[in-house]
């Protein structure tokens, strides 16, 4: 017993001694974490250079765009062929996809050899061979009469301009077919197909094997965004943000980037870690000086690096008693599978003995231990290097997502990763140390890269059909210049009808006289109260106007909320609430006492009979208070003041918010004679010649007309541009059938139009995996601020997804792109319609005055105009295109319509005083 223990101890000591000797001899091949982190940073820099238009030509890591922008979502259908060419074995698959069946993916495949003479022959010979094999496969499967879509996994560096257009940059993996480099791969295939003439095929997609691996995984795991090959060769791909790819393909979405990381170090940047064995092997390789990283990592080259180490050690008398056999000197006699066999835990040393015997080597137990440890060091270096470069990709993904911790899935394929007994464990362990802030799930590719090529093709087919249906739906929102000119013409007709006495009652655009005949002249002076009611929030203001050499306006205000139950309760409750808020404000300012002049901004359609009398025509914007329509709102306010018996008010003017906005801007800019609101609602006003205002006596000077253009189209004159989505939104609005133009423009309804389109697309399976969530069913979820945020140019898709998440909508990257597209189409139509309306207004002013050219300023207010990143630009452009004889400037109202009401009140008090004197 003691003797056995001593013997075991002796062999353990012997083994440890041999290991230490090998460690010392190959010390330079062991890489510290510090070195690996440095390599990680070098690769990260090379990735950035490869994605840059300026640095890409000189970058060693080419970061090739694949034009694969989407991964499978599980709804793909169809019958596809996949070709998988990347080594001495060539595979053809038939992949049938139907998500409605128990087995959503059914595959049949055949493996064909690619002889050495074909690999090193001409390009035409190679592709003739590929098509001969495909013909044989189709014959066997009895599908030669079908023209099936084909996905081609072509595992060599290609420069792609489309998903089906790929130019071969260079051969790798011992391929050297002449006349193929620099040519389009699909054209070479098509040429070979035509030459055969016995069948046809539609090449839809060309993908790298790494891309195929990643896409194959995407069908099972939506978190998969990295593909990794560690086998005969090595490479990685990942989903990059388009905004980070500096080649002008847009900012929205992602694209799979084929890194071609095997070229890392071809510029000499890895010479500090490349050793004499790497350099010696390079000289005898098919492509000396190229693929330097791959030659330190991949299985094809690992076997030769190990062999060269053994030869050198034998030459130095450190192994095999200095004897070298012809087999040991011959490339290909020692394989990667031998490395894997030698590194097995239990039978590794036994396998080493058998393999060395096969190589004709007389070996001792020490030799076997040494050979095993050499294999360990070389394969460990490979695992460490791959961990470093993958770590750089993971860090880039994390940075792109601006997240402190990354969660992602990596799909892995390759014989070295799959069959080596220690490789994956070592690789994972190193990766965890290098990127501790990433949670990575590794999924092994079971079906190879061919299925991935078929899935890319299936995705392309799905996206093409989805794109067709999406465009068909959104086309109804895209308005041509001719259509916009027609809208302008029809609105102008309605304006003329509204101004004439005999047709006013039939006009949808009421063209309401405001009885405002003058803008401030600078002599106004005093303290004025203003109320601003037009939505769920309303303001009470104290406005102090001082005239003199330097006119000033000082404002104090407080915002109050109107609960929904009061908005839709009784009129008495509404006005009592308003007066209660006024009372609070007077106490807040310490001015409850003297009877103060007040201007009332009342942002609803009113028929005015004087500056201080307005009869409510109809509620809009969600208000439904009873016993108000048909009544004078000033009287309702005065009655509420009397009921409270705390203070008195001198209500001088009731004005629309649009009129108030125009007055606010006119105080700053005298050429301002048009007002525009584009916010919760939409409306416009302008200064009309009194001779055209038949509803009011007098032909002198001008009067501001409150158009109430939101009702344009209520008579059906705009039905040809209304969509089914507009009709649904109108049907469920509080005042169905009314305010049709406003419903297509204003912020309160744009979100509803978007929501209904998204529901339709979700039902069709284009969004949110076809699942209509409870939040998506909720009316009003898409507020104007969310539309504005989603359409921001500066907002990355990740942030769009965060906004949708905030709304309770779990989205993919593709979902976010489509949501952003829908928002853009709906808001663009709104801006164009608003522009067409404004063009009609300024053209009328120009024609009224008989001018060849009009210079005019429009005062604008409203959250949609102010906050939306695209609305104002599109609207301005539309006005310019539709009214080319008008120079229109837009002035943003900074102080809102409340200030305008106070200014109108000040003008009214001034005119009242002048009238009393006269």
UniProtKB/Swiss-Prot annotation:
One of its GO terms (molecular function) is glucosamine kinase activity. Pfam families: Hexokinase_1, Hexokinase_2. It comes from the Eukaryota. Residues 16-458, 464-906 form the Hexokinase domain. Pathway: Carbohydrate metabolism; hexose metabolism; Carbohydrate degradation; glycolysis; D-glyceraldehyde 3-phosphate and glycerone phosphate from D-glucose: step 1/4. Hexokinase is an allosteric enzyme inhibited by its product D-glucose 6-phosphate. Hexokinase activity is inhibited by N-acetyl-D-glucosamine. One of its GO terms (biological process) is inflammatory response. It catalyses: a D-hexose + ATP = a D-hexose 6-phosphate + ADP + H(+); D-fructose + ATP = D-fructose 6-phosphate + ADP + H(+); D-glucose + ATP = D-glucose 6-phosphate + ADP + H(+); D-mannose + ATP = D-mannose 6-phosphate + ADP + H(+). Its main location: mitochondrion. Its EC number is 2.7.1.1. The N- and C-terminal halves of this hexokinase contain a hexokinase domain. The catalytic activity is associated with the C-terminus while regulatory function is associated with the N-terminus. Each domain can bind a single D-glucose and D-glucose 6-phosphate molecule. Monomer. Interacts with RABL2/RABL2A; binds preferentially to GTP-bound RABL2. Interacts with VDAC1. The HK1-VDAC1 complex interacts with ATF2. Interacts (via N-terminal spermatogenic cell-specific region) with PFKM (via C-terminus). Interacts with SMAD5. PANTHER family: HEXOKINASE (PTHR19443), HEXOKINASE-1 (PTHR19443:SF80). Belongs to the hexokinase family. This is Hexokinase-1. It comes from Bos taurus (Bovine).
């Amino acid at each position: 017993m003691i003797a056995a223990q001593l013997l075991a101890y002796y062999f353990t000591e012997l083994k440890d001694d041999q290991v230490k000797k090998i460690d010392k001899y190959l010390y330079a091949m062991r890489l510290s974490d510090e070195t690996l982190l440095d390599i990680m940073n070098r690769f990260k820099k090379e990735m950035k250079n490869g994605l840059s238009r300026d640095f890409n030509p000189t970058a060693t890591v080419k970061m090739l765009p694949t034009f694969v922008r989407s991964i499978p979502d599980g709804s793909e259908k169809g019958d596809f062929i996949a070709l998988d060419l990347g080594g001495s074995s060539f595979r053809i698959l038939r992949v049938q996809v139907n998500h409605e069946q128990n087995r959503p993916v059914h595959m049949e495949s055949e493996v064909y050899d690619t002889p050495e003479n074909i690999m090193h022959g001409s390009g035409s010979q190679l592709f003739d061979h590929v098509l001969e094999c495909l013909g044989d496969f189709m014959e066997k499967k009895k599908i030669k009469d079908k023209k099936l879509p084909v996905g081609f996994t072509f595992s060599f560096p290609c420069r792609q301009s489309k998903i089906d257009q790929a130019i071969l940059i260079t051969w790798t993996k011992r391929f050297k077919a002449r006349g193929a480099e620099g040519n389009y791969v699909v054209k070479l295939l098509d040429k070979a197909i035509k030459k055969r003439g016995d069948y046809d095929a539609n090449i839809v997609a060309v993908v790298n094997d790494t891309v195929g691996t990643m896409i194959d995984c995407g069908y099972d795991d939506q978190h998969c965004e990295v593909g990794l090959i560690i086998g005969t060769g090595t490479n990685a791909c990942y989903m990059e943000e388009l905004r980070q790819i500096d080649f002008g393909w847009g900012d929205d979405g992602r694209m799979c980037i084929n890194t071609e990381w095997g070229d890392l170090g071809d510029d000499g940047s890895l010479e500090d870690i490349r050793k004499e064995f790497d350099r010696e092997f390079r000289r005898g390789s098919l492509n000396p000086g190229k693929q330097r990283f791959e030659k330190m990592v991949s299985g094809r080259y690992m076997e030769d690096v190990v062999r060269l180490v053994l030869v050198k050690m034998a030459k130095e008398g450190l192994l095999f008693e200095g004897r070298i056999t012809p087999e040991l000197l011959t490339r290909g006699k020692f394989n990667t599978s031998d490395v894997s066999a030698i590194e097995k835990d239990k039978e590794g040393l036994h396998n080493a003995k058998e393999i060395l015997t096969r190589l004709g080597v007389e070996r001792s137990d020490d030799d076997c231990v040494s050979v095993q440890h050499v294999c360990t060091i070389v394969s460990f270096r490979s695992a460490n290097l791959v961990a470093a470069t993958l770590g750089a990709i993971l860090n880039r993904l994390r940075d792109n997502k601006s997240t402190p911790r990354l969660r992602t899935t990596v799909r892995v394929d390759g014989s070295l990763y799959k069959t080596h007994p220690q490789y994956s464990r070592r690789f994972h362990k190193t990766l965890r140390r290098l990127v501790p802030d990433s949670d990575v799930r590794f999924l092994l590719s079971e079906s190879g890269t061919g299925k991935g090529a078929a899935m890319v093709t299936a995705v392309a087919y799905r996206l093409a059909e989805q794109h067709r249906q999406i465009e068909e739906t959104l086309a109804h929102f895209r308005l041509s210049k001719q259509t916009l000119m027609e809208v302008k013409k029809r609105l102008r007709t309605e304006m003329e009808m509204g101004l004439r006495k005999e047709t006013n009652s039939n006009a949808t655009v009421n063209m309401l006289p405001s009885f405002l005949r003058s803008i401030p002249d600078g002599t106004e002076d005093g303290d004025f109260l203003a109320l601003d009611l037009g939505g769920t929030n309303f303001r009470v203001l104290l406005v102090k106007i001082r005239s003199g050499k330097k006119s000033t306006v000082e404002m104090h205000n407080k915002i109050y909320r109107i609960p929904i139950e009061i908005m839709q309760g009784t009129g008495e409750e509404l006005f009592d609430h308003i007066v209660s808020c006024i009372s609070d404000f007077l106490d807040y300012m310490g001015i409850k006492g003297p009877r103060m002049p007040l201007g009332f901004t009342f942002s609803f359609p009113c028929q005015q009979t004087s500056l201080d009398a307005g009869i409510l025509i109809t509620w809009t914007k969600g208000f439904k208070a009873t016993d108000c329509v048909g009544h004078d709102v000033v009287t309702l306010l005065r009655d509420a003041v009397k009921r409270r018996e705390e203070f008195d008010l001198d209500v001088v003017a009731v004005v629309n918010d649009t009129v108030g906005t125009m007055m606010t801007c006119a105080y700053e800019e005298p050429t301002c004679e048009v007002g525009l609101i584009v916010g919760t609602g939409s409306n416009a006003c302008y200064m009309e010649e009194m001779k055209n205002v038949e509803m009011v006596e007098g032909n002198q000077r001008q009067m501001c007309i409150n158009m109430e253009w939101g009702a344009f189209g209520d008579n059906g004159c705009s039905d040809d541009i209304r969509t089914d989505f507009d009709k649904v939104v109108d049907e469920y609005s509080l005042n169905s059938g009314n305010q049709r133009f406003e419903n297509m423009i204003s912020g309160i309804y744009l979100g509803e139009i978007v929501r209904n389109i998204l529901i339709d697309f979700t039902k069709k399976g284009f969004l949110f995996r076809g699942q209509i969530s409870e939040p998506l069913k909720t009316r009003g979820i898409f507020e104007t601020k969310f539309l504005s945020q989603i359409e921001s140019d500066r907002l990355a898709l990740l942030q769009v997804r965060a906004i949708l998440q905030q709304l309770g909508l779990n989205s993919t990257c593709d979902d976010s792109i489509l949501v952003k597209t829908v928002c853009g189409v709906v808001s663009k139509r709104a801006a164009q319609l608003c522009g067409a309306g404004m063009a009609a207004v300024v053209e009328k002013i120009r024609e009224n005055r008989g001018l060849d050219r009009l210079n005019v300023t429009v005062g604008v207010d409203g959250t949609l105009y102010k906050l939306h990143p695209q609305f104002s630009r599109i609207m301005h452009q539309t006005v310019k295109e539709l009214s080319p004889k008008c120079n229109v400037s837009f002035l943003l109202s900074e102080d809102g319509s409340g200030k305008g009401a106070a200014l109108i009140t000040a003008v009214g008090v001034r005119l009242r005083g002048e009238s009393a004197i006269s």
